[in-house]
Each structure stands twice: as structure tokens, then as C-alpha cells.
Amino acid sequence: MKKKLLVVINNRANYARIKSVLIEASKSKKLNLICVIASSGMLDKYGNVEKMMIKDGLNVSHKIYTIVEGENPTTMAKSTALLIMELSSIFSKEKPDIVFTVADRHETIATAIAGSYMNILVAHSQGGEVTGSIDENVRHAITKFSSIHLTSLEEYSKRIIQMGEDPSTV
């Protein structure tokens, strides 16, 4: 039986980082790829990701509009809360084996929180990185919510292990 891999794509940059992974996963005989586009990834003014994915031959299973206008801490918190609610409904319906999320934005932590509370394995890429911005705190929190850690450098892997994560999951 195929494993269900649900990937949440939140913006154009996240899509660009994992496009090749998505294309290969869509061809896999072992995986059933479920793509969810959310947040700014749905908006034309930020480069509508759905159009890019369709052009690349990928299916979009779910679309979520959750951006609360304002681009300030209050609206980011509200957008995060909306996305947790919407993703929880999708996760309940789809029953994925693994949820994959990218980077460190408020949408990423929403994915990690929803998956963790629903006892779904959460795979996170780009953990362990250090930037000095608020995103760093969010990224480290996402790491703690995640079950599988995909890093780009050995230095980042070591940092995740120093945070107390099991080395076999990094």
C-alpha cells in the first residue's frame, strides 16, 4: 500500500526549493502525493503557485486561503491560527502518513503544530539554520514539533542534535 505524503506549499520560494522532490514523489510507486497550497502561495500578487505546479505537471489536491491582510505581528498570528484550523480539517480527511513542510514562516509552524497534535509524522526541511531574525525562533520551534529533519549542511544537523533531537531522525 502506498504511503500518503502530504506536502504543504506556502509560497513561491518554498515551491522552488522542493519542486524537484515533488516531481519525483509524484512518479513514485511507493508514495501517494497530496499537495496543499496555502497562504501567499494562493495569491497572484505573490506569484500564484498553483499555476506553476499545474505547468510542472503536478496535481493540487487542496487550496487554502488564510492570509489576513496587514503584514504585522497580529495578522501573522491570526493567519497562523486560521491555517492550523484549515490544515487540521484536511489532515483529518486525508489521513496522511507524513506531512512535509519547508523553512520557517508562520505557515510552516502552523503545519507542524497541526500535524503534531494529530499524531502525524512531520518532516521539516531547513531546520537548524541560524539567521538572527524572528524566523530563527519559529524555525527552532518547528524543529521541536517535527519527527524527521532534513538539513542542507552538517552544521545544521549537529545543531538539531544539540537541541535534543534523536540523531537517527536527522
Residues covered by each model-derived region:
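An aromatic- and histidine-rich active-site surface loop
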Residues: 100-117
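Helix N-cap/beta->alpha junction signal
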Residues: 11, 104, 152-154
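Conserved nucleotide-sugar phosphate-binding/catalytic loop shared by glycosyltransferases and other
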Residues: 33-79, 86
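Structural motif
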Residues: 8, 36, 101-103, 125
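Short N-terminal targeting/anchoring amphipathic segment
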Residues: 89-105
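N-terminal subdomain of nucleotide-sugar transferases
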Residues: 1-41
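Active-site-proximal region of nucleotide-activated glycan assembly enzymes
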Residues: 120-170
